[in-house]
Amino acid sequence: MFKAQATFSRYSAAVSLLLLFSGAAQAAPQSITTLPLQPDGENRWRLPAGEYQGQFTIEQPMQLRCEPGAVIQSQGQGSSLLISAPDVLVEGCTLYEWGSDLTAMDSAVFILPAAERAQISNNRMRGPGFGVFVDGTRDVQVIGNEIDGDAGVRSQDRGNGIHLFAVSGARVLHNHVRNARDGIYIDTSNGNHLEGNVIEDVRYGVHYMFANENSLIDNVTRRTRTGYALMQSRKLTVTGNRSEQDQNYGILMNYITYSTITGNFVSDVQRGDTGGDSMISGGEGKALFIYNSLFNTIENNHFEKSSLGIHLTAGSEDNRISGNAFVGNQQQVKYVASRTQEWSVDGRGNYWSDYLGWDRNNDGLGDIAYEPNDNVDRLLWLYPQVRLLMNSPSIEVLRWVQRAFPVIKSPGVQDSHPLMKLPTEKLLTEKQEPTS
């Protein structure tokens, strides 16, 4: 019925090495043709209801649709489905208990380099390893899947919900990922589109590494240890995303350049446990953290009710920051550098809920600049023990001296045109995804 096709990839290499050196007696995957498939047209097949045990390969183009009640149970070994042919569709299947060996990249669905244009749609997956692993191919679609990791396993020992490696042209849309390591991990993959995904109770909600010209639109993260971890990438478009009740960081930018961060909503980011993850340091509950990132546009975002609104450090300069709202954060800004940063563009600044200035000419802009940090703030950052003197007369004298003699003023953030009205009300009223 089907013709076999030989394929070699990182996956097959990893499995071969494991079997060679460990002497493992893992059963070899079987062809999908060993299942009682029912024809449904040319290259179209249906899998009837029932529980099917094992791991299965798809080696020729086909459309596989599972009827309600069709379950593939992999008994804690290997990958449930291994796809090595182009133009394969897998839809409506339930995949349980695949393997947990992250070195072998055990996955519910593993897509090999030859499997261009694969479509993985509306499936349910629950297991300890990776959910959907896409390895070195292009134009894959991962749409409408429910992926649930094993909450009983340490976060570091789980697989990612959706993992893209060396992938281009992928569309990852409207998936729901829970209890994985990272929700969606994009590694060395350019030109991909993520939209409408909901990610909860993971380490990083969305994690980019060395991934350029990707778009991240209208996604939601909740209760993660970092909502959106953007690292070592350029020309990202990050628009309309929400971070709700995440810990440590809402949006983290690490070596990000020439990217656009607009229309995002971040709320209730608080200090949290990093879970032993050495990649996360500090964890002060920052709505937006910008580290060594330059030439980015950060506009029309809403950052609220977090321990720290925005923190810039390590040479994060020459970014366009305007039209954002910083509302009710315990501390609005943390910035330590050697030169002053102007946070307004073309006469339009940002909204600051703690701004105490006035607008006498009713042009919607404050008449005096907003300057969130002064020499005393810098002193407190460098020497935290000084906080014991926070309300003492000596601190008040220092603040009075720097106001009276601005010549000793140190570099910091200045918003010369602060907004008097909240510019992000639309983000507050947009319909939210229901909480699970």
From Swiss-Prot:
Signal peptide interval: 1-27
Induction pattern: Induced in response to denitrifying conditions. Activation requires NosR and DnrD regulators.
Alphabetical list of SUPFAM superfamilies matching this protein: Pectin lyase-like
Residue stretches of each PbH1 repeat: 85-113, 115-136, 137-166, 167-188, 189-210, 233-255, 293-314, 316-354
Keyword entries, A-Z: Periplasm, Repeat, Signal
The keyword Phosphoprotein belongs to this UniProt entry's keyword annotation: no
Keyword Ribosomal protein attributed: no
A Pfam family: NosD
Gene Ontology cellular component list: periplasmic space
SMART domains the record matches: CASH, PbH1
Highest taxon listed in the record's lineage: Bacteria
Record-linked InterPro entries: Carb-bd_sugar_hydrolysis-dom, NosD_copper_fam, NosD_dom, Para_beta_helix_rpt-2, PbH1, Pectin_lyas_fold, Pectin_lyase_fold/virulence
UniProt subcellular location: Periplasm
Subunit structure as annotated in this protein's UniProt entry: The complex may be composed of an ATP-binding protein (NosF), a transmembrane protein (NosY) and a solute-binding protein (NosD).
Function: Required for the assembly of the copper chromophores of nitrous oxide reductase. Could be part of the ABC transporter complex NosDFY.
Protein family according to the UniProt entry: Belongs to the NosD family.
Record protein name field: Probable ABC transporter binding protein NosD
Organism: Stutzerimonas stutzeri
Taxonomic lineage of the native organism: Bacteria, Pseudomonadati, Pseudomonadota, Gammaproteobacteria, Pseudomonadales
